[in-house]
Amino acid sequence: MPRKGPAPKHAVVVDPVYGSALVTALVNKVLMSGKKSVAERIVYGALEGAKNKTGNDPVVTLKRALDNVKPTLEVRSRRVGGATYQVPVEVRAGRSTTLALRWIVGYSRARREKTMTERLMNELIDASNGLGASVKRREDTHKMAESNKAFAHYRW
């Protein structure tokens, strides 16, 4: 264990176009091999496409999508006397946002549309409407936590 205490949190830079820290976080999740300008082009294109398709503010669409994908419970493995139990625990706010962004980007990469911009746009629109693979992932996570509720007393 480190003796210095927890590492300091970095100040999140707000996005220059939309003025939102969530857009910056999404750009950083899409980022691959240090190509930030490519990631920004993908995210801005997806948000602009979502604005054209839905007619809503793209940041509102992103927030609604994140709210529909954020998990409140997850399972953690806990070893007790030779057996490993899946123990349901509550997810902290920062982790739930990070997981939601990770799932949205991951499942948009797995979609079948031609460009990443289209894939991300459609996944964001689906997630904001309560559809899509990332929302299903959240439901599966909650279902797993619900089915392992009997082991909740092993929480630490």
Curated annotation (Swiss-Prot):
Presence of keyword Acetylation: no
Parts forming coiled coils: none
Keyword terms, alphabetized: Ribonucleoprotein, Ribosomal protein, RNA-binding, rRNA-binding, tRNA-binding
Domain of life: Bacteria
Signal peptide: none
GO CC term (a single one): small ribosomal subunit
Pfam families associated with the record: Ribosomal_S7
GO BP annotations listed: translation
Molecular function (Gene Ontology), one example: structural constituent of ribosome
Subunit structure: Part of the 30S ribosomal subunit. Contacts proteins S9 and S11.
Main function: One of the primary rRNA binding proteins, it binds directly to 16S rRNA where it nucleates assembly of the head domain of the 30S subunit. Is located at the subunit interface close to the decoding center, probably blocks exit of the E-site tRNA.
Family affiliation: Belongs to the universal ribosomal protein uS7 family.
Name this protein carries in UniProt: Small ribosomal subunit protein uS7
